[in-house]
Amino acid sequence: MKFTGTKNYVSTEDLSMAVNATIALERPLIIKGEPGTGKTLLAIEVAQSLDMELIEWHVKSTTKASQGLYEYDAVTRLRDSQLGDERVKDIKNYIKKGKLWEAFDSEKQVVLLIDEIDKADIEFPNDLLQELDRMEFYCYETGETIKAKKRPLIIITSNNEKELPDAFLRRCFFHYIQFPDRGTMEGIVKVHYPKIKKNLVKDALDLFFDIRKIPGMKKKPCLLYTSDAADDLLC
């Protein structure tokens, strides 16, 4: 079971090696790189390539690590108890499984994407250390220990907005997706636009890389810019 890229995703040798090491050694993979370099898409394509379900956990600035485990709706349970609702007899009716619980609960191995982990509070990664190490967590409301039935393949993306804790990094593989060179970029364009003329690709890439070379540019154009340019050229 190896990943070498897909018909929709051009993977470099180094990136494929990182993914395959993660598969073989069952450690999370942290993917960093410029916005638009295909970090999130990698998880989607890995899942498709390996015929696994993809579970996506998109992290926001307000996201707490505990939300990946579960959320207990005590307010609704209190209200239902006041209304005499029979559901209050089973506390599980008020527990919403998080993405980590979903991944642990799957009968088959899944790909778990923890997307843009650096958006959350600095303690967020450390709060997941034990759960990712042991592949289990305790649900206080039900008194259950939730253990992973199959260890998920975990891919974590980061835009490098803030540094991740050393203790967390030590437990993961790491790969930085370098921005594609011209040859790799040509391959990416051909994958998505197989019928586009070579001279149009050359003109689009000349313009693209010239813009990226402009000194002092804070936000350089990403791969999506090339895709938009190719769409315009084909219109």
Language-model regions: role of each:
Residues 204, 223-224:
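Active-site-adjacent segment of 2-oxoglutarate/Fe(II) JmjC oxygenases
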Residues 1-199:
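AAA+ P-loop NTPase catalytic core and its hallmark functional loops
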Residues 209-221:
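A short helix-loop-helix "switch/interaction" segment in the helical subdomain of ASCE P-loop NTPases
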Residues 199-207:
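Amphipathic alpha-helical segments of the small helical/lid subdomains adjacent to P-loop NTPase cores
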Residues 67, 211-213, 228:
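Short, solvent-exposed polar/charged micro-motifs at secondary-structure junctions
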Residues 225-232:
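Conserved small/polar residues in nucleotide/adenosyl-binding loops
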Residues 18, 207-210:
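Solvent-exposed, amphipathic alpha-helical segments
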